[in-house]
A protein has these predicted regions:
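Catalytic machinery of carbohydrate-active enzymes
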Residues: 1-268
């Protein structure tokens, strides 16, 4: 049985807060012990963490391509149920995609420990936490062994406490598109000078242009025929190339109930 969204949020709060408090001094001590061996190099093996949002896994693509253009090998950690979204644009090599199975608490714990081992095996040196509110990803960021850890921080504002395990803290800007906020995280990862806070840059609309998904022509043709058949069964006039199709997703799942259509808005 899959873990519900509400259960995840409850666990993230009641378990995440004490774990962040425990992990914070441990991460600080490890940073202190490894400081004499630190090398001031640019990110070589860069991991993005975005577990629960399939849409964000697509919107972060321009940021990932920017990291690649800067010479980094990119990796991605995501929930197993959302991993298919990364295959649409194929920016991340399949062997560089790490997954966590959230279908049960035991699988979640096992895959988490397995990831922490893998992160060290692959010698991940930089990690970017794309999440805004998750303490779980904050813990993964702090404990994965990366020396350079980038993510959003509340600074002097009020909000969710996720510990202080980031080495490069970025201010989230709610007035710009999330894709631009992702670009600011990559800028912070590669910045040669410290900023407080990161990232004081201007990001153009051209920098967040999304690549087009490559779709198998046979699959596309099959779907077109299926849509025409369904339209014919419903006695709706439709022919590919003659009428347009509008896709609407009225159910945004339990992650964002605010995006759902109200039940009274549906037609019988």
């Amino acid at each position: 049985m899959a873990i519900s969204v509400n259960a995840m949020r409850t666990i993230d709060h009641w378990v995440g807060v004490p774990l962040c408090a425990i992990a914070r001094p441990i991460v600080a001590l490890l940073d202190l012990l490894s400081k004499p061996f630190a090398r001031s190099t640019e990110p070589k093996r860069l991991l993005f963490i975005e577990l629960s949002e399939m849409g964000s896994a697509i919107l972060v693509d321009p940021a990932m391509r920017k990291a690649q253009a800067n010479g980094a090998d990119i990796y991605f950690l995501i929930f197993k149920s959302n991993a298919a979204s990364l295959g649409l644009l194929n920016t991340v090599h399949p062997n560089h995609i790490f997954t966590i199975d959230s279908s049960s608490l035991w699988k979640l714990a096992f895959d988490t420990l397995r990831f922490l081992v893998k992160a060290r095996f692959y010698r991940i040196d930089t990690v970017i936490d794309l999440e805004l509110f998750s303490r779980f990803t904050a813990l993964l960021t702090g404990l994965c062994g990366a020396r350079r850890r980038v993510g959003y921080h509340i600074f002097h504002g009020e909000g969710l406490w996720r510990g202080t395990m980031l080495t490069r803290k970025v201010h989230y800007n709610p007035h710009i598109h999330i894709a631009k906020n992702f670009i600011s995280l990559v800028h912070a990862a590669f910045a040669k000078e410290e900023e407080q806070p990161f990232s004081k840059i201007t990001i153009s609309d051209q920098e967040i242009q999304l690549a087009h998904a490559v779709i198998d022509p046979m699959v596309k043709q099959y779907l077109q025929l299926r849509i025409e058949n369904l339209a014919q069964q419903a006695m709706i006039p439709f022919k590919h190339g003659q009428q347009r199709i509008i896709l609407i997703n009225p159910n945004a799942s339990d992650l964002l109930p605010q995006r759902r259509w109200a039940p009274e808005r549906f037609s019988e």
